[in-house]
């Protein structure tokens, strides 16, 4: 992996983390205000979920050149 | 009867607000692949500052207040990547020569102590 590609992957990871944590936090605020009586745990849950999703995406992104993905190909009936 | 209708209305309003938020997240694919999130962040970065500026101009026009112009922030150029890479390379090269250097220094120290005790 070249350094510019590595830099692009890091940029994508950080942007993705910001968006996902922010989205999780925002959804946590909405659910906390609407259904959960202004408790703190939906915010923590949403932010944690966003962080986990961003980490998983980053991990797949960095391991992408080395992971082999299989594909099922349907037999075409003639 | 009225209380039940009111609590049902409240539940429907809250449900629609929460459902709308979830649909917005799904529609904008904010929790999807990383390139979509990056595109959404870039779009937000392009759209939000002009919108904030226009809103502030509208507020100034309506209220007659004048927002003072702040000076531009100083541009600081610090290549973090270069200094970080140089730091990593220095640390790794130091770690790689550490065993041989430790052997050399301990040998020198032993020779020195042997010479002093003779």
From Swiss-Prot, chain A:
Residues 37-78 are mitochondrial intermembrane. This is MICOS complex subunit MIC10. The keyword Secreted does not apply. The modification N-acetylserine is found at residue 2. GO terms for biological process: cristae formation; inner mitochondrial membrane organization. Its main location: mitochondrion. Component of the mitochondrial contact site and cristae organizing system (MICOS) complex, composed of at least MICOS10/MIC10, CHCHD3/MIC19, CHCHD6/MIC25, APOOL/MIC27, IMMT/MIC60, APOO/MIC23/MIC26 and MICOS13/MIC13. This complex was also known under the names MINOS or MitOS complex. The MICOS complex associates with mitochondrial outer membrane proteins SAMM50, MTX1 and MTX2 (together described as components of the mitochondrial outer membrane sorting assembly machinery (SAM) complex) and DNAJC11, mitochondrial inner membrane protein TMEM11 and with HSPA9. It comes from the Eukaryota. One of its GO terms (cellular component) is mitochondrial inner membrane. Belongs to the MICOS complex subunit Mic10 family. Component of the MICOS complex, a large protein complex of the mitochondrial inner membrane that plays crucial roles in the maintenance of crista junctions, inner membrane architecture, and formation of contact sites to the outer membrane. It is a single-pass membrane protein.
């Amino acid at each position: 992996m070249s350094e510019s590609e590595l830099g692009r992957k890091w940029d994508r990871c950080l942007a993705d983390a910001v968006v996902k944590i922010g989205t999780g936090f925002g959804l946590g605020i909405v659910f906390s205000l609407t259904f959960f009586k202004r408790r703190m745990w939906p915010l923590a849950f949403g932010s944690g979920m966003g962080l986990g999703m961003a980490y998983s995406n980053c991990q797949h992104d960095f391991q992408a050149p080395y992971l082999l993905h299989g594909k099922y190909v349907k037999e075409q009936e003639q | 009867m009225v209380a039940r209708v009111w609590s049902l209305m409240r539940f429907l309003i809250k449900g629609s607000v929460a459902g709308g938020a979830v649909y917005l997240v799904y529609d904008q694919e904010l929790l999807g692949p990383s390139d979509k999130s990056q595109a959404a962040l870039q779009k937000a970065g392009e759209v939000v500052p002009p919108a904030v500026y226009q809103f502030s101009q509208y507020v100034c026009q309506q209220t007659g207040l004048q927002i003072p112009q702040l000076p531009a922030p100083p541009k600081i150029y610090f290549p973090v990547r270069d200094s970080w890479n140089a730091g990593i390379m220095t640390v790794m090269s130091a770690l790689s020569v550490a065993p041989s250097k430790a052997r050399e220094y301990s040998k020198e120290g032993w020779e020195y102590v042997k010479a002093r005790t003779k």
